[in-house]
């Protein structure tokens, strides 16, 4: 679901609201909360696939078209190596991963990129991710197409900073509304996405006949 669909989506959401229908009645995400034992990301992905609805997992895991870019990105990342620097006189106790981004102090140089529809994976959706990033002292980024509102994310983040990612819409009323919400609830930066003028041709979603079973919280707020 991308920018050019926004007006149609908002109209559909308004119709659903007046008819009393709810996305939550159609899709039941996991509510499990427990420590995860894992050996690597690949093994974790296999376990997740076994527990998730096929279409939802395909959306989260998949990429556009025949996934050439997805594979290229993974292969490129695999070529990044950690170079050991031994005998440099550095003590373990002296190692410090803290840094700053836009003047914001971080405990780690890794932040979380915006990801849509996290409610597909767990009922708490973006709220759980925001809490996790607060615990490790880094930044959570909320997608325009998240399943939780900016206000909800701000409430669980507490004093921990968060960013908001905006898909610029042709509907300027929506742009103004959502940016005002981000400012009101304390987002420290806006991540502007400009490389998605149309939705990706996602072959996995087509094969699975996947349709989003959950509402997009920020769009629903605008439609009210």
Predicted regions and their residues:
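Active-site mouth loops of central-metabolism enzymes
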Residues: 111-123, 164-172
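Active-site-adjacent beta->alpha loops and helix N-cap segments on the catalytic face
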Residues: 123, 142-160, 169-177, 197-209
């Amino acid at each position: 679901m991308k920018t050019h669909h926004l007006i149609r989506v908002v109209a559909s959401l308004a119709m659903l609201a007046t008819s009393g229908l709810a996305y939550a009645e159609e899709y039941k995400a996991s509510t499990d909360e427990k420590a995860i034992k894992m050996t690597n990301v690949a093994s974790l992905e296999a376990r997740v696939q076994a527990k998730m609805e096929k279409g939802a997992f395909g959306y989260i895991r998949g990429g556009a078209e025949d996934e050439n870019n997805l594979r290229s990105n993974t292969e490129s990342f695999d070529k990044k190596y950690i170079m050991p620097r031994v005998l440099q006189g550095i003590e373990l106790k002296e190692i410090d991963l803290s840094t700053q981004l836009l003047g914001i102090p971080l405990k780690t140089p890794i932040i979380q990129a915006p990801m849509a529809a996290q409610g597909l994976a767990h009922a708490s959706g973006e709220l759980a991710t925001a809490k996790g990033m607060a615990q490790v002292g880094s930044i959570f980024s909320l997608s325009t197409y998240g399943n939780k509102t900016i206000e909800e994310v701000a409430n669980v983040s507490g004093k921990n900073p968060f960013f908001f990612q905006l898909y610029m819409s042709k509907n300027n009323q929506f742009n103004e509304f959502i940016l005002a919400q981000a400012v009101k609830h304390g987002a420290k930066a806006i991540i502007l996405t400009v490389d998605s003028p149309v939705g990706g041709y996602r072959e996995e979603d087509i094969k699975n006949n996947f349709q989003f079973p959950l509402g997009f919280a920020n769009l629903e707020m605008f439609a009210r």
